[in-house]
């Protein structure tokens, strides 16, 4: 039955779709709670902001805003090809208004209504949202006990269900921060290279690749070169600090991505976004600075959580997942609301099937200390029997 009687009816898969819920905005929190200072450690943004070179490039482009941007993104495609090397062609890149658009384009191109994608529980919710928006089902396999993608179970699900057209694997995963090894991924890719007489498209989401320190996470370009059914996702929203510009991209075979290009809307990236992304890519010193700051921030939060006796998982991203239920006896949403009153926005992840956990993004040194004080105050309140 239509949600709005008397109006044209949308398909049921649209009517039942739960939209993406972003992290709570700073200004909204100030307004609702009457707080002067609010620190947001919720959306895995780069606390250093964009590279100064990216800001300058975007500002320089403003004088030409009466012109349409380059629909083919010639300069950025060539810059990306040089950046990733491995003799890549500019035609092996699909650019989108954030990775979300790229995910949407891949699903629209390679899955029909009634077919399916496969991923894991507690994976990036955009996979499921984009799939459902096009009448495509999402099959989710459980995480392992240590909150990693269970690639053995995922392979079995893909082999078992002939409707699966795409598989999404985030490495490392958000919101858990956990990762899968090269050996695990190679075994998985070998199993799904030909299923039911056809290859399944495997999308490796490497949004947090620049932050990775673990030695057993494979370079996605090696896997892309060896497995023609692999597509790799990257974003400028994380280490490059361009979340507000909305620039994401896929690396895949020219033949595969050319079909996505047919349905990509023209001018999907603004001229300032194109200019900022190209400049950010060239500023290697800024990226190194951001990675070093993130590692220091992760160490700070790991020490803080250890001191408060709140269990947490090793993270390869710019955030840490804390089991506040075991540590404080409160659910993730409960701790979120208590910290909100102290002016700190963390991220509850009950919508990922993790109601006992809270995701903490790394901020600046000052933001991290402010967030830690709020969490410590909540911890003391629980020890004293107060909620």
Predicted regions: what they are:
Residues 2-98, 105:
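N-terminal small-domain helix-loop-helix segment of the aminotransferase-like
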Residues 143, 295, 307-342, 358, ...:
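Conserved PLP-binding catalytic core of the aspartate aminotransferase-like
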Residues 91, 232, 308-311, 343-349:
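A short linear hydrophobic-aromatic micro-motif
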Residues 51, 72, 229-313:
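PLP-dependent aminotransferase class I/II
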